[in-house]
């Protein structure tokens, strides 16, 4: 009788609320691992994301970075593949609507950001504002990927770790090759025009500043995450990536990596001394590096390795002045324009007059100027909740990566324009900071207790 009543109550609730039934069915199935095609599809998405730049796509006739051409080419191929993998997974789940409810229930902030971005995309199109493709690649893609990675098993995450380390190592080696030979293999192009006077390395990530941002984030992840790698291997990768940072010429990324990385290593060293637990091998490696690194830097400097980077610190091509001039644009706008967004032609004219043709180097200021403060506030709330959700799925060392990411965001247009940076960040965070999954208690110690029988009387 009790069993029948419980089943009857469940059916009644599902009949009254179909969404609850879908969510319940999804919860029951969510424990199972994803199928092999979805797993390898996610690996392919990450490989395309990190290894294929706009300059590489131009060689096959895909004008991703340009302003002209087919609108379909303004979305990165990794985003298209991600949507296909998502559709496949929804179909194989058995109930596409139930699948979407399930992953939204597991990652609500990601679902909110995706829905909010799609709604704002419709608003952008209706108001004929720029940034249509930016809404998809910048916000929808990372939210969708986070929701799909919630189902990932250990094998999938192990493959993703391998892809990240291999591609980032290849990216650094290619950057150093370009730096040494003064030849760009896949130069950054805008509508087919390559900026050949800018000899900063582009490697696999495209624009030098995008390269510098991703590399800096990866170095911080090697310091406080990547626990699956041995310490000597991590130190070698950190050295290689720091050398690549010089080739990319990112001043903010270089300074941030040195300051945050140095502070983190100092804190870890002091913590080890305070607890009295000092790893002898780690201490020996630290002493050796402390002796060799200054020598290596001096030798590299004598061969002119840092000349290009130092030149960018001396002459920033008006970058510092642009960060001051961008605030002057608000003096020409009314409050209504600030709230809902001014006329695009007016903003473009003010930019040319103020010498800001190269861009507005702050995402919040740029988004307010082009989309309005109300639009920007909505995205900011969604972004904050999304970052909090990502951080909760990582182990404690994520604070270093999150701090570096939030600082670097404000040194360029970043999220206010079309970019794949946030997708790359969430992949690095979720994959390299994945908590160690322990064995269930039932397997570790004792057998689960048998359920008591329910009397039928």
Please provide the spans of the model-predicted regions.
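N-terminal signal-anchor transmembrane segment
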Residues: 2-95, 121, 405-411, 422
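Membrane-interfacial helix-loop-helix modules of multi-pass inner-membrane proteins that assemble, modify
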Residues: 58-66, 158, 169-208
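Aromatic-anchored transmembrane helix interface
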Residues: 108-118, 127-152
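Transmembrane alpha-helices of multi-pass inner-membrane enzymes
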Residues: 220, 399-409, 416-457
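A conserved mid-to-late transmembrane alpha helix and its immediate loop/hinge
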Residues: 242, 250, 354-389
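Hydrophobic transmembrane alpha-helices and their immediate junctions
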Residues: 285, 370-410, 433, 441-443
């Amino acid at each position: 009788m009790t069993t029948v009543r419980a089943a009857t109550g469940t059916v009644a609730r599902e009949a009254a609320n179909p969404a609850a039934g879908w969510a319940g069915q999804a919860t029951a199935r969510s424990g199972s691992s994803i199928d092999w095609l979805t797993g390898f599809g996610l690996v392919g998405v990450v490989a395309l994301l990190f290894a294929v730049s706009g300059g590489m796509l131009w060689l096959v006739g895909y004008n991703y970075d340009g302003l002209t051409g087919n609108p379909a080419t303004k979305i990165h191929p990794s985003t298209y593949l991600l949507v296909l993998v998502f559709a496949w997974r929804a179909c194989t789940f058995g109930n596409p609507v139930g699948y979407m409810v399930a992953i939204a229930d597991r990652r609500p902030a990601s679902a909110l950001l995706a829905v909010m971005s799609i709604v704002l995309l419709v608003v952008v199109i209706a108001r004929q504002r720029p940034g249509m493709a930016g809404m998809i690649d910048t916000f929808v893609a990372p939210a969708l990927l986070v929701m799909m990675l919630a189902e990932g098993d250990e094998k999938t995450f192990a493959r993703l770790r391998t892809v990240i380390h291999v591609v980032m190592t290849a990216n650094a080696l290619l950057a150093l090759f370009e730096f040494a030979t003064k030849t760009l293999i896949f130069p950054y192009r805008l509508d087919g025009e390559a900026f050949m006077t800018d000899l900063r390395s582009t490697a696999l990530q495209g624009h030098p500043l995008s390269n510098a941002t991703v590399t800096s984030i990866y170095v911080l992840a090697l310091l406080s995450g990547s626990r699956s790698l041995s310490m000597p291997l991590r130190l070698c990768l950190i050295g290689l990536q720091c050398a690549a940072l010089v080739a990319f010429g990112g001043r903010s990324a270089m300074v941030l990596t040195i300051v945050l990385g140095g502070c983190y290593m100092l804190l870890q060293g002091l913590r080890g001394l305070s607890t009295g637990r000092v790893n002898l091998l780690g201490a020996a490696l630290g002493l050796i590096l402390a002796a060799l690194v200054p020598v290596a830097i001096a030798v590299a400097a004598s061969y002119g390795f840092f000349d290009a980077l130092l030149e960018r610190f001396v002459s920033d091509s008006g970058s510092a002045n642009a960060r001051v001039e961008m605030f002057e644009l608000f003096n020409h706008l009314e409050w209504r324009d600030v709230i809902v967004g001014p006329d695009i032609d007016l903003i473009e004219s003010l930019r040319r007059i103020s010498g800001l043709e190269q861009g507005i180097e702050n995402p919040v200021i740029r988004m307010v100027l082009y989309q309005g403060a109300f639009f920007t506030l909505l995205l900011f709330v969604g972004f904050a909740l999304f970052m909090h959700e990502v951080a909760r799925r990582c182990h404690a060392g994520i604070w270093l990566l999150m701090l570096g990411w939030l600082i670097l965001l404000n040194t360029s247009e970043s999220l206010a324009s079309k970019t794949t940076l946030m997708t790359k960040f969430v992949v690095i965070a979720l994959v390299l900071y994945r908590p160690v999954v322990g064995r269930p208690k039932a397997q570790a110690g004792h057998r689960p207790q048998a359920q008591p029988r329910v009397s039928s009387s």
